[in-house]
Amino acid sequence: MKKIILLLLIVIALAAGGVYWMKAGNPNALRHIVLDQCVPNQIQNRNPAPCAQVKTDAGYVVFKDRNGPLQYLLMPTYRINGTESPLLTEAHTPNFFWLAWQSRSFMTLKHGSEVPDSAISLTINSPTGRTQNHFHIHISCLRPDVREKLNAAQGEISTQWLPLPGGLEGHEYLARRVTENELVQRSPFMMLAEELPEARDHMGRFALAMAQQSDGSFVLLATERNLLTLNRASAEELQDHQCTILK
């Protein structure tokens, strides 16, 4: 009984710490940058600064994150909080994951030489795994150890959401194989909500990641928040913003 009480106290402390961390900074900083700076500057002056790109017609911007030499963020030009937003499973919402993958070229431009697709990953964190309240997909390098595990498990990843053997970074992950054609036609948010019963009404519990495999297919990864196992559902843990994989 004492162990259970101690565990609950640890979970409560971690949850409280996460809330404090989010409130300690400005959780709306990215939203202000997009809505009050990038979009108006593009419309008025045809200059996306401080963003790297503004696509008002397509509904997104690309912004260079200060964390890491090659990390970029893809964000909508309108208010969407994150994985918990019902807008992400509506047909009219842009396919942000596919748009983020198409924006990976900014990494190569910044790097000055080609960044191979095998080194690139996309992630979005859950509400408990993020510090900003404006929807943003991290476009950055994949951790080398995660790359190795995905390579080793390539033959075991199917077209259904199934547990990835051994998990990643100490947390349980579901993996699903998708083709490029599937990814173009259907958002990973829709795939998760429509194919995983427990996710349909609780999308905010999940974080998502994506990487390309050696055969040209993509692997989608989803992890669900579980404070009992100290999992805040922060898929960004699979990324290395210092890009060791390129060295």
Curated annotation (Swiss-Prot):
Membrane topology: Single-pass membrane protein
GO cellular component labels: plasma membrane
Subcellular location: Cell inner membrane
A biological-process GO annotation: CDP-diacylglycerol catabolic process
Pfam families referenced in this protein's UniProt entry, alphabetically: CDH (PF02611)
InterPro entries recorded: CDP-diacylglyc_Pase (IPR003763), CDP-diacylglyc_Pase_proteobac (IPR015993), HIT-like_sf (IPR036265)
Catalytic activity as recorded in UniProt: a CDP-1,2-diacyl-sn-glycerol + H2O = a 1,2-diacyl-sn-glycero-3-phosphate + CMP + 2 H(+)
Positions of transmembrane segments: 4-24
Keywords (A to Z) from UniProt: Cell inner membrane, Cell membrane, Hydrolase, Lipid biosynthesis, Lipid metabolism, Membrane, Phospholipid biosynthesis, Phospholipid metabolism, Transmembrane, Transmembrane helix
GO molecular function annotations of the record: CDP-diacylglycerol diphosphatase activity
SUPFAM superfamilies for this protein: HIT-like
EC numbers, comma separated: 3.6.1.26
Pathway: Phospholipid metabolism; CDP-diacylglycerol degradation; phosphatidate from CDP-diacylglycerol: step 1/1
Recorded family membership: Belongs to the Cdh family.
Record's protein name: CDP-diacylglycerol pyrophosphatase
Organism, scientific name: Enterobacter cloacae
Organism lineage string: Bacteria, Pseudomonadati, Pseudomonadota, Gammaproteobacteria, Enterobacterales
